[in-house]
């Protein structure tokens, strides 16, 4: 029906007119058929396909796996919902976009250009997936100057040879001004960095202190040796831990998570805003929080020596890593110290004294924390060994750490070292998420799960061919365990980072879902996100469900409501997570380019991470990646591909293989295009 079509395509009120027009046009063209009962069907006789168009920066695109050459795009933009006619010529199958059902883009962030003497201008989009520029007629520029970053509202989409026409609705500032790149990124990905008046009003009404009445029916854990371990700049402390050894072969692990749902009531202005944000966004030294700071950095944050409301999971875990008993309960805690990853790692390596809160220094509690850390290290290694045994994938990929000065310019780019304390918290959060997911899956209660489906056959085949070309044996059977054995084989070898990266690219993206379908990467049947409700909405949503279950408040009416809520939460939160990841990656790429700008002409040693007919990608030890342009296997080509995606030969007969360490010289940097260009030495 028309109603179900609108729901499926997520048609907003301001899109109804164009939706109706497009639908009527498709009916006239006999592409969509309308029945007497006002139901709509795709004309199956026309070999048509409906889907989302994904634009490649090189000009071509895809609708799902169907290739769309540049000549057949028909003015579609990245993300548009389109109707495609499938064509087959000889052995080639490709698509032609014949109609655009729903436009995905109505505003574009980019750089305004106006040539001297012209009364009009145009905007070059920041997104590499918006290939054509936007024409800005006289009077539509909002007084923007050349090289200003602007937000453009599309007034007319491209038709035939006519360009898109737009109107500047906001000038963000000159492109090199402090903070303009940040504003460009958050506007590009529609990330809201301001809270509504209704939300602010609700926050102001929340008391600054916890009342005694709020502690009723909760376990008092304030005397326990509970502490947090976080990054030195972290202010939103979601999780705290406690641990003791109850027998020679048995640990009792407590994971205590901020009770955000106590403050964020369902369907309140605060809840609606958190739902729409979906996640906190971390742009190097800037945080766009899911929740206002009064909650994220104060009332909900498990700050030391402050009474905080929490949800606790206690687990008895034996020396094999098996959870033999567990309890989920509402609680309140008082963290005894805020520890930092960097310091705890050095403490384990006997390089520094443990830095605890001054109030417990040289007390019995300090000794308890040190003993707890010793137990935590033991248990984390047990849990990791168990995960590895079942085949959980451990990608050997470095994360970067970028430091900015007061002018937002990068002063260092380096590998973010992860030590034993990082791995302790990671293992403890994983086992907690597994326990919670399995418990509520067994209860058959509506829930939000974190799922990771197995790789699609085509992408996995590409990866397996790649490792075969590198000389590794192809596995006979396919499972997480066999893939992890490949990662184990390459550990410490030059191609380690590359193989990990290509395997990661072969994986499907993890997402939120209302049914438990397992987590391929972790090789586990049950998984959820429970441990970060300050910064992730799915965690907040399942906290509500858990608390209603614990308090026996799950009426049939509420269960029905939750059934719908978890579906909506999973869809929207997955989408918001992708946008946040893209924004974080984009901002990181910009800052890496800025860091390299003043190093043109300098030489570097890096590792080859990929080879194609057009370029060789090179990764430097500090995680900066650049490309070397080449031409291979065509009439003008002076390079020869020896093995697809693996090796290439230059005109002098020198071979370059993925994983090789090579010396390169920095040739050029384009911050606007986010490209770092090397040349071979």
Where are the regions a protein language model picked out?
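Electropositive polyanion-binding surfaces
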Residues: 7, 146, 156-158, 184-191, ...
